[in-house]
Every structure is written in C-alpha cells, then in structure tokens.
C-alpha cells in the first residue's frame, strides 16, 4: 500500500501521537509500557517522568505497585540497555533479543577477554543467583574468587547479557536503587524465560511482533530505524518487514522508504502539540537513525552528550526546544529550563504551568517549589 510522500512535520506529529505526547491517556502504567514496547530506564527517575508526561493523574505509587506485583520488570533489553518492560513482553521477547545481547558482549570480550568460558561463567552465576538476590558488586567478588585470572568486568558483562536476570524493586524512591540486587527472571516471574525461540517459525513470529510494535509506536520508519531501536540484525529486520508488508502503508521521505501500520493514519501536520517534558534517555529521542523528526541537527550536541548520555528535554511545538533539570537548595526545589532560543510568551507560560506540576512530582517533600525558564 503506497501512501505517497511524507513531510517532516507529518513525521513529527505521527511520532508525538504514537508516543502519547499530544494528549495524556487514561490507561494503566503497564498498558502504556506495553504500547511503547518498553521504557528506557538508565536513569532511576526516567520511567516515572516518562509515564507522568503521558498518563492522566499518574502518581509514583502506580508504577511502584506494578513493579512490586511483578507485572513490570527492569532488565537488560533493547540495545542491551536497562528498560522497564511488562512481564509478558519480557517472557515473549527475551529470546528475540538474545542475539543483540550476545553481540553486545562479544564486542567487548574480543577486545578485553577473548578466552572467557561464557557458558561456564553463566552457569555458575545462575547457581549463585539461585541462592539469593545479589548486587553486581557481590557477583564480581564471587566471580573473582572462581576465576582470578580472568577479566571480572567482562565476566560480569557476560552474565548481564546472557543470563535472564531482573532487578529487585524496593519500596522507596524510584523503585530501583543505584546499586540494585538482581535475581533470576524465571524465579521472579514464576515461569521459564527462554533465551532461544522454540523453533524457526516461532522466532520469526516473535520478531514480526516486535517490529510491528515498533512501527506502531514510532512509525512511519524504515529498516535502519527499526535496527537502531532494537539492535536486531538488518537482515532479520528486513525479512520481518517483508512478511508484514501486506499490513503496512508505505511512505517516502525523499528517497527513503518508510512504513507504518496501514490502519493507523497519519495525523494532520498542523495538529496542536502542547509543551512536554521528557526524561533523560527517553526512547522517543533514540529510536530512529535520523532523528530530525524531533531533534533539529543544530541542537544535537545539546541533547546527545558525551558518555552516551541523553539530556532531559522539553518539547515546544513538537520539537526539542531546550533542556531541564531539578535542583534542590535550602529545602526548596527548582525546575530550571534552558531553552535553545527565544520562546513565545504563550509557550513560556505553558512550560511554567507544566513544570510546576512536574517539580512537585519529582520532589514532593520539598518545602517550596519553583520553575525558572
């Protein structure tokens, strides 16, 4: 199905709508996480802010309950990075992503420790985690005792990328501390978490599902976009696209083919887009090879920082227009917005209004709250 050329603003508005950044939704936190195919969770507060900006009446207790009842887990996921995902998605797609995780490990191992016996290390670590939840500091000490001549960092990474483990939530803060304990995913969830598909057909079906989910949440997009988001091999993504093609609409951005679900039409390019705050590492900023549909090229260095960090940002008229942070002093909390350029009076007022709610969400116990733009 060919639907013609798509403009930058149409791509922007499609992304905003499919990421629920035009209108907050009245659904549960697990439902939103499922629709987004996971939330980047490198920053402890990130998933909370990401849900706050997308859901009606979202409170910390909502996500805390979902992590406590194990309907949502935090684990290595897309591109090998920590994500919050639904338990159902983790069980279904851990095997789909195992090649991505393995490749991430081998890129490091071939430089630092090519002789590591990965199978032995992972099997031993499984027994170690089966005894009790462990921090990675505890795991490192134990691995060093077992294999004193091997690179402990590489062994630790082998465990993280090959053994299905999830972080154990706590009852304070943002549910997951800076130095969390990990436990076996199958014990936490009460059923096996496979690392290989049952057969080739099951593997293709799962890959198709993941690609379809991406196109629904981030499309229209191309093969290289899916690859950038998931880390899956290009040939696997291309094969999934061909299997899904009868259900997809096809667009052109210049000479590039983009695809999206045929039953999800593009929104109008003039759809109003209210100001929004995004957390660090929000996947909306990381899920396309070419990111101009939301970040202008001249702002890349202010958003994508050294050390692979991604700044918390503000959206104005649908595009990244600045960064933000919360600082505390003398019992008060201030949300500071640093715009990339001059803001219209109405946009500034809307950012202040949104920011006043956000700073109270992030620092509920502060004596005073303020917003500075």
Q: What is each PLM-predicted segment?
A:
Residues 1-291, 296-373:
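Long, low-complexity intrinsically disordered regions
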């Amino acid at each position: 199905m060919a639907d013609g050329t798509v403009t930058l603003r149409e791509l922007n508005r499609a992304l905003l709508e499919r990421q629920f950044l035009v209108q907050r939704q009245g659904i549960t936190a697990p439902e939103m996480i499922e629709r987004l195919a996971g939330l980047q969770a490198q920053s402890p507060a990130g998933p909370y802010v990401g849900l706050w900006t997308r859901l009606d009446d979202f409170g910390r207790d909502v996500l805390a309950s979902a992590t406590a009842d194990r309907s949502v887990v935090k684990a290595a996921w897309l591109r090998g990075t920590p994500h919050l995902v639904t338990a159902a998605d983790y069980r279904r797609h851990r095997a789909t992503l195992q090649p991505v995780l393995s490749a991430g490990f081998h890129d490091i191992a071939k430089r630092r420790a090519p002789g590591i016996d990965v199978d032995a290390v992972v099997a031993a670590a499984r027994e170690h985690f089966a005894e009790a939840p462990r921090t990675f500091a505890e795991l490192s000490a134990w691995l060093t005792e077992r294999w004193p001549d091997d690179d402990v960092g590489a062994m630790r990474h082998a465990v993280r990328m090959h053994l299905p483990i999830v972080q154990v939530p706590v009852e304070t803060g943002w549910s997951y501390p800076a130095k969390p304990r990990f436990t076996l995913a199958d014990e936490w969830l009460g059923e096996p978490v496979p690392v290989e598909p049952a057969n080739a057909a099951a593997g293709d079906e799962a890959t198709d599902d993941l690609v379809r989910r991406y196109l629904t949440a981030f499309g229209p997009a191309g093969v290289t976009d899916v690859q950038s988001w998931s880390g899956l091999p290009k040939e696997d993504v291309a094969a999934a696209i061909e299997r899904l093609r009868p259900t997809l609409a096809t667009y052109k951005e210049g000479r590039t083919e983009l695809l999206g679900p045929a039953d999800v039409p593009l929104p109008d390019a003039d759809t109003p887009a209210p100001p929004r705050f995004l957390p660090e590492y929000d996947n909306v900023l990381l899920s396309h090879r070419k990111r101009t549909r939301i970040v202008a090229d001249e702002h890349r260095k202010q958003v994508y920082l050294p050390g692979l960090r991604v700044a918390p940002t503000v959206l104005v008229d649908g595009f990244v227009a600045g960064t933000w942070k919360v600082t505390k002093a003398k019992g008060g909390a201030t949300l500071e917005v640093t715009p990339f350029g001059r803001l219209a009076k109405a946009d500034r007022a809307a950012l202040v209004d949104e920011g006043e709610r956000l700073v109270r969400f992030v620092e509920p116990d502060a004596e005073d709250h303020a917003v500075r733009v």
